[in-house]
Curated annotation (Swiss-Prot):
One of its GO terms (biological process) is retrograde vesicle-mediated transport, Golgi to endoplasmic reticulum. The keyword Membrane applies. It is found in: Golgi apparatus membrane. Belongs to the RER1 family. Keywords: Golgi apparatus, Membrane, Transmembrane, Transmembrane helix. It comes from the Eukaryota. GO terms for cellular component: endoplasmic reticulum; Golgi membrane. This is Protein RER1. The chain crosses the membrane at residues 41-61, 63-83, 140-160. It comes from Gallus gallus.
Length: 196
């Protein structure tokens, strides 16, 4: 391998200015993501605010309905992945590997692990809104369409998809919404001491 053959390196073997700039930009972005991780409510409020701004923009411009429809389908897809277990119980039920321990399903504890974790769901949904917002600045994405048909398609698709997901949840007895491990409180310490 000769000098300068690796990606991002200049002729002299040092990383190029552009490569260093984008590397640093990626590090700053990742740092902000890492800092925002514990603030779930704040993250979702910001995302809802961006969504509201996007809807106002589409309403005022009276266009970009195809972009909005695509954003809705994308968010529906993310939501279904968020509600789905990482390992599909129907695939586990059909396996012919023979018996495994424990033999009764009701005795086995299986924690619910999502196919799409909450943070990745939020991150993807926010990026989707920002991309859709960027698309509204380009007239090429403003395809003329009769928007009530798109609304009806979306409502129909949402109802069919959620009905199937709820049936799956009932059949395999899992609830995707839990609040974590229960916390048990002991008796309160009133501060009194006993003299012996």
């Amino acid at each position: 391998m000769s000098e300068g053959d690796s990606i991002g390196e200049s002729v002299h073997g040092k990383p190029s200015v552009v490569y260093r700039f984008f590397t640093r930009l990626g590090q700053i972005y990742q740092s902000w993501l890492d800092k925002s991780t514990p603030y779930t409510a704040v993250r979702w409020i910001v995302t809802l605010g961006l969504s509201f701004i996007y809807m106002i923009r589409v309403y005022l411009l009276q266009g970009w309905y195809i972009v909005t429809y695509a954003l809705g389908i994308y968010h529906l897809n993310l939501f279904i992945a968020f509600l789905s277990p990482k390992v599909d119980p129907s695939l586990m039920e059909d396996s012919d590997d023979g018996p495994s321990l424990p033999t009764r399903q009701n005795e086995e504890f299986r924690p619910f692990i999502r196919r799409l974790p909450e943070f990745k769901f939020w991150h993807s949904a926010t990026k989707g809104i920002l991309v859709a917002m960027a698309c509204t600045f380009f007239e090429a994405f403003n395809v003329p369409v009769f928007w009530p048909i798109l609304v009806m398609y979306f409502i129909m698709l949402f109802c069919i998809t959620m009905k199937r997901q709820i049936k799956h949840m009932i059949k395999y007895r899992y609830i995707p919404f839990t609040h974590g491990k229960r916390k048990y409180k002991g008796k309160e310490d009133v501060g009194k001491t006993f003299a012996s």
